[in-house]
């Protein structure tokens, strides 16, 4: 994995727009201590290290989300669609969120006030899952890209796509992965600059909480 320090917003834009590959996707982390591990795999225990137990736990959470959020969800959601919505609202799943837009990833890297180096990951094209031919997310056997329908404001505003990880406890890496690092001192500067360009809580989340956060910043 290639690692490159970023020195300014212009430097970042120049680097990401000069990358090879037409299918690049981007993901921002507020700390370089975080690996590319889905939330469902971040709390590994001896029992959950068993694949059957891991899947059972995830399905339990997903079914509970479907049941308890039924009054807020469109009817007839497929398992994939439910998984997309659940992940965007914080449920632990085997999905990782990415964006086609490098500025969205930069927002998620620098929006936190936490100290330390932030990171934007950039990955080249991965084979996609055809969700119509593979209706069960839990039978996917390799890390794959998943392209969701623009079924919610968040998915559309964030130009979202996902990767699905058959072993969510394993950190993802590849030879085509690029890691852009952002120093603590630069994070606040970049956050202010991209807000002026329209990348902020209200534009990317579009709910009352995010609008209030934008005003309060």
Residue ranges of each PLM-predicted region?
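Catalytic-core elements of nucleic-acid end-processing and repair enzymes
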Residues: 1-217
């Amino acid at each position: 994995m290639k690692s490159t320090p970023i020195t300014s917003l212009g430097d970042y834009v120049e680097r990401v727009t000069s990358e090879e590959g037409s299918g690049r996707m981007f993901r921002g982390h507020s700390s370089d201590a975080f690996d590319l591990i889905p939330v469902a795999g971040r709390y590994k225990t001896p029992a959950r290290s068993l694949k059957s137990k891991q899947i059972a736990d995830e399905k339990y959470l997903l079914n509970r989300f479907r049941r308890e959020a039924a009054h807020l969800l469109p009817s007839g959601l497929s398992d994939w669609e439910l998984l997309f919505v659940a992940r965007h609202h914080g449920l632990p799943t085997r999905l990782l969120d990415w964006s086609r837009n490098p500025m969205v990833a930069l927002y998620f890297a620098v929006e936190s006030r936490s100290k330390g180096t932030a990171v934007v990951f950039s990955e080249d094209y991965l084979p996609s899952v055809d969700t119509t031919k593979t209706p069960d997310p839990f039978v996917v056997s390799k890390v794959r890209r998943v392209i969701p329908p623009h079924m919610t404001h968040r998915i559309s505003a964030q130009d979202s796509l996902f990767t699905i990880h058959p072993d969510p406890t394993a950190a993802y890496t590849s030879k085509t992965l690029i890691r852009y690092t952002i120093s603590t001192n630069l994070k606040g500067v970049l956050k202010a600059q991209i807000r002026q360009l329209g990348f902020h809580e209200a534009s990317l989340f579009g709910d009352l909480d995010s609008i209030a956060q934008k005003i309060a910043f």
